[in-house]
């Protein structure tokens, strides 16, 4: 059984080196090229899908659309869930990463970005950036909507979705592709590979490059490789 993971192509805020999180930004021109290239590589590798999953953020949705178009699989059913969103960067969203490091210190910013259980500064309740003000989240329990997340909290929303929704599709023999985000995918990879809290700090997933897992019957990885050529 194979599972394909794809981090969205470069976004406009990736290009500007800004903390993005749940803020909904589009792909950059380079990101579009990355997504299209990913689709072409998937087609060349002969990978076919029966069902696709993505977040409710434009950059991941568009990446998946380009991948399916370039691999001639636009008809594949797509399921969107906020549980596959990027981690919520709280009050850091919209800030420049370099300027934030200069203000708070590089070590502190590195902890906010890469530590498993260090929370970023949270959004204030009345902050206009609160996701509860976004129509796509209006059906959610307000208690489920974060004001900021670390990787641990992100994992706690990603893995139940994996267990309840995605894994049963794979076990039923359906071929799955997931287009999501750096940290929601890091959370899933941590779970699949049993990566420690410390080791996960070093894991970086490149934008727009398909990551292929070969899984056993227990959905444990027996092999993995990037389609980067």
UniProtKB/Swiss-Prot annotation:
The active site is at residues 8, 86. Its EC number is 5.4.2.11. It catalyses: (2R)-2-phosphoglycerate = (2R)-3-phosphoglycerate. It comes from the Bacteria. The gene is gpmA. Pathway: Carbohydrate degradation; glycolysis; pyruvate from D-glyceraldehyde 3-phosphate: step 3/5. This is 2,3-bisphosphoglycerate-dependent phosphoglycerate mutase. Gene3D superfamilies: Phosphoglycerate mutase-like (3.40.50.1240). Belongs to the phosphoglycerate mutase family. BPG-dependent PGAM subfamily. Pfam families: His_Phos_1. CDD domains: HP_PGM_like. One of its GO terms (biological process) is glycolytic process. Catalyzes the interconversion of 2-phosphoglycerate and 3-phosphoglycerate. Substrate binds at residues 7-14, 20-21, 59, 86-89, 97, 113-114, 182-183. SUPFAM superfamilies: Phosphoglycerate mutase-like. GO terms for molecular function: phosphoglycerate mutase activity. The record marks 181 as: Transition state stabilizer. The keyword Nucleotide-binding does not apply.
């Amino acid at each position: 059984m194979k599972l394909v993971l794809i981090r969205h192509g470069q976004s406009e805020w990736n290009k500007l080196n800004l903390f993005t999180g749940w803020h909904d930004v589009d792909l950059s021109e380079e990101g579009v090229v990355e997504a299209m290239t990913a689709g072409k590589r998937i087609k060349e590798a002969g990978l076919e899908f029966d069902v696709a999953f993505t977040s409710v953020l434009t950059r991941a949705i568009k990446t998946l659309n380009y991948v399916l178009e370039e691999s001639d699989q636009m008809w594949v059913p797509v399921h969107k869930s906020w549980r596959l969103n990027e981690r919520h960067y709280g009050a850091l969203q919209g800030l420049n990463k370099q300027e934030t490091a200069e203000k708070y210190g590089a070590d502190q910013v590195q902890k906010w970005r890469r530590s498993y259980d260090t929370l970023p500064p949270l959004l204030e309740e009345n902050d206009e950036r609160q996701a509860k003000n976004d129509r796509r989240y209006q059906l959610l329990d307000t208690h489920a909507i974060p004001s900021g997340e670390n990787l641990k909290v992100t994992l706690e929303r990603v893995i139940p979705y994996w267990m309840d929704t995605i894994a049963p599709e794979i076990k039923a023999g359906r071929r799955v592709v997931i287009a999501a985000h750096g940290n929601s995918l890091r959370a899933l990879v941590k779970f699949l590979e049993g990566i420690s809290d410390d080791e996960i700090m070093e894991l970086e997933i490149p934008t727009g490059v398909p990551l292929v897992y070969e899984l056993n019957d227990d959905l444990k990885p027996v092999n993995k490789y990037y389609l980067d050529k």
